[in-house]
Amino acid sequence: MANLRIALVAGEASGDILGAGLMRALKAQHPAVQFIGVGGPLMQAEGLTSYFPMERLSVMGLVEVLGRLRELLARRKLLIQTLIEEKPDVFIGIDAPDFTLTLELKLRQAGIKTVHYVSPSVWAWRQKRVLKIREGCDLMLTLLPFEARFYEEKGVPVRFVGHTLADTIPLQADRTAARAELGLPDGPLVALMPGSRGGEVGRLASVFFDAAERLQALKPGVRFVLPCASPQRRVQIETLLEGRNLPLTLLDGQSHLALAACDAVLIASGTATLEALLYKRPMVVAYRLAPLTFWILKRMVKSPYISLPNLLAQRLLVPELLQDDATPEALAQTLLPLIDGGEEQTRGFDDIHRTLRRDASNQAADAVLSLIGQKQEAL
């Protein structure tokens, strides 16, 4: 039997992690498989021949995309030509939908099987993208169950594979060990997580610090920990903290340790809320956008919730305080009872964790190999 040739394209670090896990699982069933495409250091370490550095696809923000648009379009065109000539057994686009969905469509039209791993947020907004997905994608692999239900309703072949974070984060995190590792004392501890991007931090950090000062008055002895997403964010946060006297420990990265160590979390809506959920830490979710952006999104977004815990629970499991509702007083008062309580939240989190814990990389590999008729049956 000829060796399998699988093409993969990832556009950012999170996709590189998922891609590497998937490649390991594919190699377990087909040790001689060949991998071509675009990926980062983790995928290359698993044997991917990357046609160009993944960083060339890692662009955030409209202005940056426009500045690189000519290069991105040229790279995509060349990639389409190369992969059509190479004729892999299957192509897997990992996240990066603005780049990979068109790639999948062109390759499928050329007779190559296509898989998309990680659903874009079509269930929330720009739902017409599902038409392109249905036309260009033989199989959608979703990390979350409500995404799979959406695609089933839209007639897109789909498999819910679970989330790799749910596989790696323990069902019960050791709070005492995490505090010891961070050198934090006993007593009430709140994690402040105002986001990873400069704009988010600029809009939320000062509000979070004001809320923390109110919490100090409401719960004497409370301390705070804030994991900084990058050196740039740390500088920004230190500037915003000038003149304040909060009992706050800043960390460089280490968000998982901060979550394991804390009793409750004040957090910006985003992927970090899933991490807080998996660590079973009660949370209050807040978000502020530029007023015009909020006005536009309010009219475009189809979902009643914005935070992943509520989307996963399909109910209001965690408080969401958005825009003008995200005042320091409201945040402090909502968070206060969760520091020593929050059992309803944590019970819901445990149920969700068990649902997402499915050995995602092996599930994804099985789905890909079944699609192309190459699944090895267990002996």
Curated annotation (Swiss-Prot):
GO BP terms in the entry: lipid A biosynthetic process
Cytoplasm as UniProt keyword: no
EC number(s) from the headed UniProt entry: 2.4.1.182
GO cellular component, one term: membrane
InterPro entries found in the cross-reference section: Glyco_trans_19
Enzyme class: transferase
PANTHER family, per the entry: LIPID-A-DISACCHARIDE SYNTHASE, LIPID-A-DISACCHARIDE SYNTHASE, MITOCHONDRIAL-RELATED
Function: Condensation of UDP-2,3-diacylglucosamine and 2,3-diacylglucosamine-1-phosphate to form lipid A disaccharide, a precursor of lipid A, a phosphorylated glycolipid that anchors the lipopolysaccharide to the outer membrane of the cell.
Name of the protein this chain belongs to: Lipid-A-disaccharide synthase
Lineage: Bacteria, Pseudomonadati, Pseudomonadota, Gammaproteobacteria, Pseudomonadales
